[in-house]
Amino acid sequence: MEDQREALRKIITTLAMKNEETQTFIYSLKQMLLNVEANSAKVQEDLEAEFQSLTSVLEELKESMLMKIKQDRASRTYELQNQLAACTRALESSEELLETANQTLQASDSEDFSQAAKEIKDGITMAPAFRLSLKAKVSDNMSHLMVDFAQERQMLQALKFLPVPSAPTIDLAESLVSDNCVTLVWHMPDEDSKIDHYVLEYRKTNFEGPPRLKEDHPWMVVEGIRQTEHTLTGLKFDMKYMNIRVKACNKAVAGEFSEPVTLETPAFMFRLDGSTSHQNLRVEDLSAEWDAMGGKVQDIKAREKEGKGRTASPVNSPARGTPSPKRMSSGRGGRDRFTAESYTVLGDTLIDGGEHYWEVRFEPDSKAFGLGVAYRSLGRFEQLGKTAASWCLHANNWLQASFTAKHANKVKVLDSPVPDCLGVHCDFHQGLLSFYNARTKQLLHTFKAKFTQPLLPAFTVWCGSFQVTTGLQVPSAVRCLQKRGSATSSSNTSLT
């Protein structure tokens, strides 16, 4: 009995679920019926409006062409009537002269005859009939106003509802990835004059193959494209690839997307490695700020943790409050934090080949800052540019302003104002490290060296801050300058 009740309960549950599904489907069908009525009324209204527009155009054309016929008829009628009136008057004058001549011919008085004959002769000379052109000024042919609308009639008879546009085909051979821009070119398989615009979608990915159904990044949409090409500008290439697809749209409907393509977007990505930074630097992923209390705060926390319960003396420098190298050993390859007066932080990604580019913006009020590259082996007490393990540009705004290139404790003064944003270009295999004004791409300095170890981006700042921009491709202007100036570089050989 209990088993039967349980079975009946299951049946009731199943029926209730099915009833709910059916009710939902019924509601959906009713909504679809309403939508059919509304959408039908909408497209019918649009169709009537389009035909009314065509009718209006035809009526306007008809009135315009009828007016042309009327104007031509009036002009020709006016000319012919004037010519007819002139000829009629000439004929009447000629007939009068003819009658006078006949009467004179029958006269018997010789003296009267001679006088009349002379007058008739003079009258004939001045007669209008002899000065008139007996050729009509205009033609009665109106064939130039004939029409043949057979072709237009066929076009009207071919009117139909808008077809769904075909899917475009992306032309990879004509597409280009350069200067953090992507230029995409596509074409339509069939000529379609009804296409109103195109929609382009793109998203970043780290997967090389065909686009996957699920990605961490959503599709970004660009609408209203009128041509069969488009350039995406101002991109940050923080992932290895980009998926792109395009669809065509007419006034009514959008077609299917093209086959998606995957374009490689090579660029140098790194973050600041906080485990290497001086304690007086507050480091985030791509920015750092000098903090006079940073080392002291760390020292206080360390001492409190050890139970010593006393703070560092206010007169102590940040370097004096820094724990020993053994205690500050970093988890990244045994790299210790920089200390003493080396207010330095390194990037977290090695450069062991190829070309790379990044930009750095320093706070204008920074008292001193530097940027460049260094070997991982750069000592924790060593400042950028003062050993053979690092190359940098250094700006000093404290007491006496200076802008210099430094390597192996050798200095070259640069005859250039300090830009608000600096670009760094490293060509590892060519042994070139170049610095540019990031805005104008003016070359500031180039180091020539033979790099014997992988490099790390390196930065230093005192009483200031900086922001790094990564995910950048080597700009075309920089590549051109490097090729053009490879033989006559601005580098100082004494700094290599």
From Swiss-Prot:
Residue segments, region Disordered: 301-336
Domain B30.2/SPRY: 290-477
SUPFAM superfamilies recorded: Concanavalin A-like lectins/glucanases, Fibronectin type III
Gene name of the record: Fsd1
Highest rank taxon of the organism: Eukaryota
Pfam assignment, any one: fn3
InterPro entries: B30.2/SPRY, B30.2/SPRY_sf, Bbox_C, ConA-like_dom_sf, COS_domain, E3_ligase_FN3/SPRY, FN3_dom, FN3_sf
Name of protein: Fibronectin type III and SPRY domain-containing protein 1
